[in-house]
Amino acid sequence: MIRRLLLTLGLLVAPLLPLRSQDTLATYANVLSHSETFLLTSPTSGEWTVDQSILVTNPKGRSAAALIIYTDSFRRLTSFSGEITPIGGGKVVKLKQKDLVYYSLSEGLADDSARWAYLPDGPCPLLVHYTYKVTYRNGIASFPSFLAVMDEKVRVTKASYTVDVPEGFAIKHLSGGMDYSSESKDGRERHSWTLKDFGGYAEEESMPSVFELVPYVYASPVSIDYGGYSGTQSDWKEIGCWLAQLQEGRQELDPQQVAQLQEMCRDCTTDLERLQVLYRYLRNTTRYVSLQFGIGGLQPMAATEVFRMGFGDCKGLSNYLRAMLAAVGVASDYTIIHNRRANLLPGYASLEQMNHVMLAVPLPEVGDTAWVECTNPLYPLGYRHSGAAGHQVVLVHNEGGEQIRIPGYPDSLSREVQHTQVSLSPDGSAHLTLRRELFLDHVEPYLDFRNLKPDVRRSILTRGMKLQADELTVTGVTDNFDAYAAEGRGFVPEMTIDYTMSTRLYANRNGDRMFVPLNPVAQMLSSQKGKRINDLVFKGSSVYEDHITLPIPEGWHVESLPKGEKLETAWGQFSSTASAENGVIEIRQVIRLLPGRTPAAEYDGYRAFARAVNKCYAATLVLKKDGE
């Protein structure tokens, strides 16, 4: 809970699901007490006071006592004290503000965004106590969000959060896993949330969002008076109106740059062609830098500043491309989104739900809207990447915000296919010629593949394989990333990687027999051996296909082949076949993983499925020498 990220756009909001305290966990730390109070002294100012004590019992729990405080022109750290007490005996360390490490987050910019940090050291067990106050000024868009813990295997004995406002001052709030009460007294209204004996959570592969498991509180004033910009945030339309104010005058470009952009697009005949030219220009002339700059991290850098500096964050780069498009007559919409959470909370509009900005560019000539990721121009135009496809977003118009959902893709389009041609020698060594075909979201880890060093390429291509490659050479990389103009809304990115591998240990020869692995280039399914604590969650469907061709070495014949296998389960479908004809062995294995959520108590079923699939991947065929 101490590693509170106070960035207004940087927090996930938890889904409204029951919280489960995992009381049986062996924990690394215990939050003995944690209290936070936000005292609103005026519509534009307040004081946030935090007091917390954490017992660290295991070095793995040290991060639970790490301190991070963000400040900027709206928030100032006005007091701090701390104490580190070794439980086994030793010197008590007293902390003052000068002991915190200070990081400027806006070097060279007209802003004072910064981070104060401290990580306690010393042998465990260790008792850590912090008390500090942050003063808010010039406006409040939201109150500090409360998250009980941010690290696994951390218990909470007791915690509380209070928002103290003048009576009649309207706020809105959302919470999970905490008890709420309110009290009006002496002209003040106190909104309070309390928590006792939270058992912590454990991190596991394919688990639910941690924000389902952690108690939380989100609260905001209904009216905003922030940095001189006033508005309301009862719904997304009102929030859009307020954000539009922050963008006024930020799209202006110098006349010389406008003339340059118009010259660059002189021969373009469609809006898509203009977008392609300027997207390429954005890629070649700017870089992404994470900033919390301008009106508490909510206002984009001016387009002229991004042009001058050559960098920007998601807000600044999106605003810059929007300005460049406007200069050549192309309309676009500034779009706020959470790139790790697809659904917004119904009936609760708040800036905390968003952590990213994109650009929506309507393109009637291809019957589509291009959702442009300005922080990573390696994404092909027209592709709705996995952090956007199917997500609810808000378009920011002058007349207000418009909540819509970015179209997703059919699950059937998400595929990875590998073709492997094996040239097997009688001594068990082999030379492999491979082709990896990637479709839709499977291309994302490979967007920058051409620019990677050979050892990094090798690591990516062999990840999850049992086969140990002595040599690996990439012989070709192709893609269809420029096909959006021809395919429009039906565009699906594809990439093909051709490569070769050599290995001395493909098959195991034992006398007159060779034991040949059926599919040593497969990526095995993972499953944990111990008891499952969290539900198992697969968010989408994917298909993985392996096609292996193995000519039988001269002087050898097939003695046995694994029998075919077909599995149908709630977690996926799998098939495996192996056949020999005209001196060639053909192996085909296909797995389709299905989306869904499985209770932890039923994890044994998934484990059995994963082991059955891996057994098929690891099966062997037997070749025997002729005449023996």
Task: For every predicted segment, state its role.
Residues 1-24:
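Bacterial Sec-dependent N-terminal signal peptides
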Residues 22-628:
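A sensor for short, sequence-defined functional sites
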